[in-house]
Amino acid sequence: SSAASDVYKRQDIQVLMKDSVDANGLQRMQVSDSKTSFTYKGKEYQSSVVRRPDDSLPVVINEQGDKFVDNSITLRITSGGKSIVDKVFTKESFASLVDAKFMKHSILEGLVYDKTTPQGIVYAASVCYPQSDLYIPLSITVSADGKISLAKEELLEDLHETDSI
């Protein structure tokens, strides 16, 4: 498939971020910290996702020449006081899944808890062109023992499709 087919347009534009702009004209997304609890295979889990603009990452410049600070996102999952995952993701974490040209001008925008499946705990991540509706949806699956696998999310245009057995 062509790389362009992996890029989706958002339906709801509210997602567009409120950026702050500093003296150097660099735009930053706000720091966000979201906590979730869920049960997986009979155990209680707590998860925290902290997104922060990370000045150690290369600055992203869009076609208009606006400059953006890319984000790093820390995912922590604990169960019964034990750490299952404590990992920092950057857009480079997904380099093997995202077209290099898209990668260059995009930022790691977000990571949210999605669902649990027999394979593990699933988080949805997105790499996007800053302040646009173009993004690549990605998924992070964490197994019960903390192994992490990354995949590109294939968004089904037709939700009525059933998987053939």
Show which residues each predicted segment covers:
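Short hydrophobic/aromatic-rich beta-strand segments that constitute the beta-sheet cores
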Residues: V85-D86, Y123, S149-K152
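Beta-propeller blade signature
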Residues: I73-I77, S139-A144
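A short local loop/turn or secondary-structure capping micro-motif enriched for an aromatic residue
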Residues: D55-S56, S93-S96, Q131-S132, E157-E161
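Acidic, glycine-rich flexible loop segments
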Residues: S96-P137
